[in-house]
Amino acid sequence: MSLETSTTTPAGSPLSDRELDLIDKYWRAANYLSVGQIYLLDNPLLKEPLSAEHVKPRLLGHWGTTPGLNLVYAHLNRIIRNRDADVIYVTGPGHGGPGLVANAYLEGTYSEVYTGIEEDAEGLRKLFRQFSFPGGIPSHVAAQTPGSIHEGGELGYALVHAYGAAFDNPYLVVACVIGDGEAETGPLAAGWHSNKFLNPVTDGAVLPILALNGYKIANPTVLARIPHTELEALLRGYGYRPITVAGDDPTDVHRQLAAALDEAFDDIAAIQGVARGGGEVQRPVWPMIVLRTPKGWTGPKVVDGKRVEGTWRSHQVPLAETHDNPEHRAQLEEWLRSYGPEQLFDDDGRLRAELRALAPTGDRRMSANPHANGGLLLHDLDLPDFRDYAVPVTRPGSVTHEATRVLGTFLRDVIARNKDRFRMMGPDETASNRLDAVYGATEKVWLSATEPDDEHLAPDGRVMEVLSEHLCQGWLEGYLLTGRHGLFNCYEAFVHIVDSMLNQHAKWLATSRELPWRRPIASLNYLLTSHVWRQDHNGASHQDPGFIDLVANKRAELTRVYLPPDGNTLLSVADHCLRSRDYINVIVAGKQPALAYLDMDAAIAHCTRGLGIWDWASTARSIGAEPDVVLACAGDIPTLETLAAADILRRELPDLAVRVVNVVDLMRLQPDSEHPHGLPDREFDALFTRDRPVIFAYHGYPWLIHRLTYRRANHAQLHVRGFKERGTTTTPFDMVMLNDLDRFHLVIDVLDRVEGLASRAAMLRQRMVDARLAARMYTREHGEDDPAIANWTWEPSERNSRSE
């Protein structure tokens, strides 16, 4: 367990000649199946010479990384059998999909999951035909692949997913292959630091395997071209002990890799044994493997006079014209026959018994490990009753609170009751986001050195903080995919850093929902706070509500967006999201002192509906009476400004019939034909009318509301105010004025939109224009908002006090 680097040698190999021969054949079988998937439509066992009819007309797939993935898989199987180890396999180079499909088939799992693909010659034909073929399976290690928790299409997340899977899984080892191209990405570079958060007592282990095959699509890789001493120094600096395996002779590499894996697993067992024996938990130096083998190994060495094996040319399809080019087709047949398929499969196309015996059985197969189908292991959270954390509200808009601070007390007890299955992630923002009540039940995970002034750091904390949104999301995804629960809290503007990760997770969920053998997992829950309307102190760089738009673009059955206006609605929404499965939930809530509007019973009813009329804030109250105008709002600050506008209107224009509608569940605005939460037209029209002006104050970019409602009968009368990319360092009210979302402008919108009102209320309009000017002048003179604006509360009028 020292920091010295060791390179294994054949002399120390634990393999007998017989074992080596069998492992080599198993590797050849996986390689044969991989090549067959890329190229063949028929003739899977080469019972006759290859013809054009046997070859796919359109070749898709990636060969270059695949033999390396198959090599590691075969050797991990030996480790699992010999040690009864619990191992899952994460493949960063996910474009090596044919290799993982091949290994799942060799282990028998594939035929168990997809019963139409039998373990015989016809099953092989179907296996080959379906790969990267219309109506078949994709080219990457997607959700369709048994044993996968990581598609590896978009590069950078393999290592962080692996660590997420290992947290709170003390007996699991996650073998994670990292491509040397992927190692150039930012998330992967940060991911090496995950070992500083891995507790050897309560967590499992991650074994990184850096696959140095030297090339990306068309370029060399950085880590393959720096001196090996420099590479090892880099990895030691990250806190790992690298064990190097290098070569291009299969026999030599087999012996090296077997010894390297034995050494690594011995090291892991020793680290965990010491840590679990008692005493102070310290950060260990974990082993890892550097595997330097040729790209496209065992494939064609030269094609059309150009080197292929060991170069970038082997990345995808080394022989690209096999359907129409007889020379390429002959070379493909030679390549396939080089694996000796008659030595690997019997006459019926079944893997020979002595090779099948090399694979683990049951749940120990990496392709059948339940950790890679996390819904099988998922247990409900033991949630406290969120109603016990309610903000007392005797009258709407009269009590001030901090919504996320209220939520923090609830999350504190969620953590206390679920110490083995719930974690909270944040990029150094948990306290800033007013969630620090959680430290009453736990600490922040930290295994590095500490200083006397540090607070809330411990090896066994349930809060994970690192200043990388990529790591926060990646850890959480790995944690969820292996059957646990969590929450990612983040500044609203900076969650955009993981936009693309959300895209990939949404694609995974969409696919897994269509697979009956994939069990539902806990939802990916985002809490976005420190939001656009209260980042007046940090300025434009911190002001961007566009993550909602990204989520709204995703498939309707996956996504939910909630904008609770106060603490009690936030509690109700959070409880709902933590209980949900297979969704991406986005909650946007404020952290600054704000008004509370609904008592808990009213909040629950409102959140259950997803939107509704706030009768106590409306003046259009008579049964059967149509409003003159609808004031709609979504988000805490738009709600505040809408209510303040309604207050002005009821005082200045008492005969104007105003209806206030608040929206919590944004997807309720869509028709029910477009989203499961969507409102039928008749219900939408009942709330928003078919012909009256609707002034909609919205938290984010206003055009999203138009997108969600464009099919509605009254869309032409819908006028939305929201964020228009006008921000700076200023006061809270100046921020809403910059974007025409302020109460005075909302009143002006009403006067301009309600037929016949503009001329009758011209003086009120002028006063609203003057009020905006006065508010701005006050900020320029005093550096803060006018107290009459900043301290506004809702006061009941005689007309509607009865409902309050």
UniProtKB/Swiss-Prot annotation:
<dbReference type="Pfam" id="PF09364">
    <property type="entry name" value="XFP_N"/>
</dbReference>
<comment type="similarity">
    <text>Belongs to the XFP family.</text>
</comment>
<dbReference type="Pfam" id="PF09363">
    <property type="entry name" value="XFP_C"/>
</dbReference>
<dbReference type="InterPro" id="IPR005593">
    <property type="entry name" value="Xul5P/Fru6P_PKetolase"/>
</dbReference>
<dbReference type="InterPro" id="IPR023962">
    <property type="entry name" value="Phosphoketolase"/>
</dbReference>
<dbReference type="GO" id="GO:0000287">
    <property type="term" value="F:magnesium ion binding"/>
</dbReference>
<dbReference type="GO" id="GO:0005975">
    <property type="term" value="P:carbohydrate metabolic process"/>
</dbReference>
<dbReference type="InterPro" id="IPR018970">
    <property type="entry name" value="Xul5P/Fru6P_PKetolase_N"/>
</dbReference>
<dbReference type="InterPro" id="IPR019790">
    <property type="entry name" value="Xul5P/Fru6P_PKetolase_CS"/>
</dbReference>
<protein>
    <recommendedName>
        <fullName>Probable phosphoketolase</fullName>
        <ecNumber>4.1.2.-</ecNumber>
    </recommendedName>
</protein>
<dbReference type="InterPro" id="IPR029061">
    <property type="entry name" value="THDP-binding"/>
</dbReference>
<dbReference type="GO" id="GO:0016832">
    <property type="term" value="F:aldehyde-lyase activity"/>
</dbReference>
<dbReference type="Pfam" id="PF03894">
    <property type="entry name" value="XFP"/>
</dbReference>
<dbReference type="InterPro" id="IPR019789">
    <property type="entry name" value="Xul5P/Fru6P_PKetolase_ThDP_BS"/>
</dbReference>
<keyword id="KW-0786">Thiamine pyrophosphate</keyword>
<dbReference type="InterPro" id="IPR009014">
    <property type="entry name" value="Transketo_C/PFOR_II"/>
</dbReference>
<dbReference type="InterPro" id="IPR018969">
    <property type="entry name" value="Xul5P/Fru6P_PKetolase_C"/>
</dbReference>
<keyword id="KW-0456">Lyase</keyword>
